[in-house]
Amino acid sequence: MVIPALKRRLEALREVSGGKVIVGVSGKDSLAVLDLLHRAGFELHPYHLYIVPGLEFRERWLRWLERRYDVEVLRWPHPDLSYLVRHGVYRHPLPEFPVLEFNDVFDGLRRELGAEWIATGEKMIDSLQRRGMMKRHAPEYLERDRRVAWPIADWNDRQVKAYLRQRRIPLPPEYAALGRGWGGSPFEKEAIRWLRDKHPGDFRRYRLFFPAVEAVLYHEV
């Protein structure tokens, strides 16, 4: 990543956003974006998308971020939660429950936080589909119609991890155990076992929302 190119990209984002940006904080890529924008002097409005609200292992992490960056992180339901509730995944279904898409969530965040532009940690290397979509918006990586920015679109995972190490930003706690963020697969056996064994209070809370979640541990692939 060439530093002058990154600076030009951030200046382009500042120009369209007025320096006021919504940014997620849940995974390693979004953390790099949060820190880059903070260092560049943007007014940040961070959010965290949850499947189950109020998990203490996650709340401790969010409180640490709030202290480090002097911000308040908005807790907001992940769009996947609407699908899980409607279709009864490890719980009773609610067939009339409305299913939301990410664009619905983004619109809700804009209304709640009072900013228009959203910066995400998505990268071209993540998938071929994402690469094709993002390359159309190079070199600024601003999707103006949707008001979405990808500041690290041309980074790779090695660069992201190196940046976080340099900035002494620890990964969320589940990375040490699972090697990835929690949000990628909230019902994967490995993740649920980790929650049950290491964070039993949070596991009990998970069961309040998804009473049959323990079945994950006994499912044979």
Question: Across the structure, where does each feature detected by a protein language model lie?
Answer:
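Nucleotide-activated chemistry modules centered on ATP-dependent adenylation/adenylyltransferase
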Residues: M1-V221
